[in-house]
Amino acid sequence: MRYTWTDEKYRDNLRRHHIAFEDAIRIFEGPTVERVDDRFDYGEVRVYAIGLVNGLEITVIYTERDDDERRIISE
């Protein structure tokens, strides 16, 4: 699986949450709980994934771009 993000979202997320996307995506190395965020029409399917990184609970919001790419939106 390939993970991508925009530089703007990366910097904003690092400033607000103090965790880099490279670290946050490690939740996918173990079990996750996921649900579709259907609160709004985003024009794409957004998924909340919750998992652990070094014992810390992390939530990652992503969208599937194709069969092998997840676009990280937020952590």
Predicted features and spans:
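Ribonuclease/tRNase effector modules and their secretory precursors
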Residues: 1-75
